[in-house]
Amino acid sequence: MTQLTNSISRSQIEQLVRQALGQQLGSAASPSSAPNPLVVNISARHIHLSQEHLEVLFGKGAQLEIQKDLYQEGYFAATQTVAIVGPRRRMIPNVRVLGPCRGDTQVELAFTDTISLGLEVPIRISGDLENTPGCVLMGPKGVVELDKGVIRAARHVHMSPADCAHYGCANGDKLHLRIESNGCTTVLEDVVVRENPEVKLEVHIDTDEGNAVDLDHATSVKLFVPEGCKCKHS
């Protein structure tokens, strides 16, 4: 018997299985066979605070107070809001804090918000804060000056392992999202997969994107793996 000199890792096997499932299901997985309903939500400008910064802005011992639970279990919009100040004293007031607290403070804005503040902000996955601009946060009890932490959140989809298997994708892959609405049907590319066994299937796009595709009046949404380029180059 001939022995294979190169072993296949578990992650490679999982990827091959997902690809095979994706081929069986077709480039756009059938919604009727999906393990979970596809939900697309607009993520408006918001802030994630560290406990340290929460206490600077709202007073020693401050805790986030729940105003509304979010779609993902354990996450919520807090009653607390702060003002964001950019260069040349440009300000956006009443920006909602989301909970629970995180290890690092992070500000998530749409493109039009960054223009209003006078900031050049990169598109990043949540938590990737190196080489990002900072800003000033103003609360009722104090001020925090961030040297980094302002991002435009990359459009992304939260998926469980069952969802990934259904769509034929893996953590970090980029999918396409087709949104059908009257007069402005659009396909959004580069929807980053964020796999976690504890999440519900949910796509997040920002306010600019949601308005551009008229998400509030969408008649259909479909998530699918992009097909490889079939064009012939000379």
Regions found by a protein language model. Name each.
Residues 212-234:
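Extended, aromatic/histidine-rich regions of cofactor-dependent oxidoreductases associated
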Residues 39-41, 46-88, 93-140, 145-178, ...:
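Short beta-strand-centered segments at strand-helix junctions
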Residues 93, 183-191, 228-234:
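Short, Lys/Arg- and Gly-enriched loop/turn segments at beta-strand edges
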Residues 17-25, 58-62, 217, 225:
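Structural signal for hydrophobic packing residues in well-ordered secondary-structure cores
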